[in-house]
């Protein structure tokens, strides 16, 4: 048989994959056979399979099969990759929930976020080199959802607005002590110290990130005001006024939430206040298997209900919940555009398969937040005996003024 001609087996595999996908506006092509869905919607993309094994892997396991085949160049997508992934997320097709459940349980065991497991998982994603992340993040190297005051705001302006919002939600005051877990490259801790006069201890187990953060703090003359600690958050022992964690809960692991809650309680007692910013879902379900295996080992974005297991055991009062899903979609659009403009550089640094995998990861993330498959939650909370509770949300939208600070708080006791 000619290498350009499909067999009966190939056509059956295409038909099987179509049944899984349903009437998605995506054409499937293998050699001389083209499968077009029965839909009135315009075709958004054409998926071209280079060989039968690529098609077979996708028919058996769409998530992992497509991710690996696309990364290896055995599948090409002609058209809008983000839009095609949006269609997939919005459809009812795909592998069964039971299959996903079993796979998730296996990955939970394999990638358990113990102290040793967490270090391995974080190293896999965050220690890829600072030069790689510098290609497509903002100038302060923030790798979490930004806040766009306007649709036209730059990524740099939006990331600064996010840090300002975090500080305002916490209502930081000069002289207070703050502990941050999962501090990334250090931007938020440095911003807090410079703009709000607080003293910060920031924990991280990524060696590359913590080294970068320490050098940055030294250049800014913040010795004694910001301390970056290369250690697991579970080893935190000091007392603080404020606990803050941006983009770490999704790395904690569902079976470690109670342990995490005890760490927070140890830090702020029943009178402090805290803030969590994390990727989540509307309902409990596993993370995409390919993302979890290849990109984010140990990752789990919880539902809002699941995340309450961090607050309820310690009798923390949840004061405010906000969803910035569309802000993360826009953040990712900026990252993706910068990544694409640096694609050839990424290939030279990491290889073509790596570059294609990360393109797919970023495209898939844009699609997931646009469609609501993923959410971005910010939760403000306080100890049950915290003496200060914000009376209104006005402080989020007006500049900080020291002389009006007392008017914005009401004493709980």
Regions found by a protein language model. Name each.
Residues 213-214:
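Conserved SAM-binding loop
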Residues 234-243:
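A short acidic, Gly/Pro-enriched loop at the edge of an enzyme's catalytic core
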Residues 279-389:
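Substrate-binding/catalytic lobe of Class I Rossmann-like enzymes that use SAM or dcSAM, i.e.
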Residues 174-184:
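Conserved class I S-adenosyl-L-methionine
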Residues 271-279:
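Conserved beta-strand signature within the Rossmann-like core of class I S-adenosyl-L-methionine
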Residues 1-159, 165:
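Feature captures hydrophobic
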Residues 258-272:
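A short glycine-rich, Lys/Arg-flanked "PGG" loop and its adjoining helix->strand segment in the class I
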Residues 185-196:
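Conserved SAM-binding loop of SAM-dependent methyltransferases across substrates and taxa
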């Amino acid at each position: 048989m000619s290498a350009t001609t499909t067999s009966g087996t190939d056509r059956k595999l295409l038909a099987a994959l179509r049944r899984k996908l349903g009437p998605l506006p995506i054409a499937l092509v293998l050699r001389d056979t083209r499968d077009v869905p029965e839909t009135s919607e315009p075709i958004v993309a054409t998926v071209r399979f280079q060989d039968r094994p690529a098609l077979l892997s996708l028919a058996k396991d769409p998530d992992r099969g497509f991710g690996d085949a696309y990364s290896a160049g055995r599948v090409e997508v002609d058209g809008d990759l983000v839009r095609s992934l949006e269609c997939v997320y919005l459809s009812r097709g795909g592998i069964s929930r039971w299959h996903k459940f079993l796979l998730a349980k296996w990955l939970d065991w394999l990638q358990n976020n113990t102290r040793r497991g967490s270090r391995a998982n974080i190293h896999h994603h965050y220690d890829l080199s600072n030069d790689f992340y510098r290609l497509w993040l903002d100038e302060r190297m923030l790798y979490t959802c930004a806040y766009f005051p306007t649709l036209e705001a730059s990524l740099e302006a939006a990331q600064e607005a996010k840090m300002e919002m975090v500080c305002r939600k916490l209502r930081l005051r000069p002289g207070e002590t703050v502990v941050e877990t999962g501090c990334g490259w250090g931007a938020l801790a440095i911003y807090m110290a410079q703009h709000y006069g607080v003293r910060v201890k920031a924990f991280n187990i990524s060696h590359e990130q913590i080294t970068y953060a320490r050098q940055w703090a030294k250049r800014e003359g913040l010795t004694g005001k910001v301390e970056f600690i290369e250690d697991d958050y579970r080893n935190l022992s000091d007392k603080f006024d404020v606990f803050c964690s941006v983009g770490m809960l999704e790395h904690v692991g569902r079976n470690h939430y109670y342990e995490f809650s005890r760490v927070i309680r140890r830090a702020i007692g029943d009178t402090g206040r805290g803030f969590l910013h994390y990727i989540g879902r509307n309902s409990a379900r596993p993370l995409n298997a390919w993302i979890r295996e290849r990109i984010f080992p140990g990752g789990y974005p919880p539902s809002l209900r699941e995340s309450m297991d961090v607050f309820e055991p310690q009798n923390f009062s949840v004061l405010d919940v906000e969803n910035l899903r569309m802000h993360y979609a826009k953040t990712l659009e900026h990252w993706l555009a910068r990544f694409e403009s640096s694609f050839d550089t990424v290939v030279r640094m990491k290889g073509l398969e790596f570059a294609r995998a990360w393109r797919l990861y970023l495209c898939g993330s844009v699609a997931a937040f646009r469609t609501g498959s993923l959410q971005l939650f910010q939760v403000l909370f306080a100890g049950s005996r915290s003496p200060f509770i914000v009376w209104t949300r006005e402080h989020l939208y007006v500049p900080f003024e020291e002389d009006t600070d007392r008017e914005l708080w009401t004493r709980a006791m």
